[in-house]
Design a protein with these regions (language model features):
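Bacterial N-terminal signal peptides
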Residues: 10-20
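SH3-family beta-barrel domains
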Residues: 21-39, 46-52, 57-102, 107-117, ...
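Bacterial N-terminal signal peptides that target proteins for export
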Residues: 1-11
Length: 149
């Protein structure tokens, strides 16, 4: 009886410890055209200029610099003030149909091609995500067709 109770307590403690290790992935978007660097310094090598709205995954935050990963998997550094909390997604499919409802059988609202940036309109659910195009169209895409979730 004591052994079973001790085992349950040990398992509960182990699971609680593992839960603390799990971290939510944080995404942001580029606020304005911003230089991305290979080091956390404006004296580093300039890698590229990121367009406004580009979604990035936050990897590490150091003082005024944030290490980010883009849809291609490239890791670079950006000044903290170059990012916005606004959530955007980047289309990864060659062509994707945005539908009126989260269902393959629902009518198409519009189509997008690879690398188009869309605003996240609502959290993903059941394999679909609601998106908004800069020109105003809103609809649903399969989560496998975008990056930034």
């Amino acid at each position: 009886m004591r052994a079973a109770r001790s085992l349950r307590i040990a398992c509960a403690c182990a699971l609680a410890g593992l839960a603390g290790l799990a971290q939510a992935i944080e995404f942001r978007s580029v606020a304005a055209p911003s230089l991305l660097y290979d080091t956390p310094s404006d004296k580093g090598r300039r890698v590229l200029i990121a367009a406004p709205g580009t979604p990035v995954e936050v990897v590490v935050t150091l003082d005024k610099w944030i290490k980010v990963r883009d849809a291609s998997g490239a890791i670079t550094w950006i000044a903290q003030d170059g990012l916005s909390a606004r959530r955007t997604l980047q289309v990864t499919a060659e062509r994707a149909v945005v539908r009126s409802q989260p269902d393959e059988a629902s009518p198409a609202v519009f189509e997008v091609v690879k690398n188009v940036i869309l605003e996240l309109a609502a959290p993903a659910a059941d394999g679909w995500v609601q998106v908004r195009h800069a020109e105003g169209g809103t609809g649903y895409l399969r989560i496998g067709e975008v990056w930034g979730l």
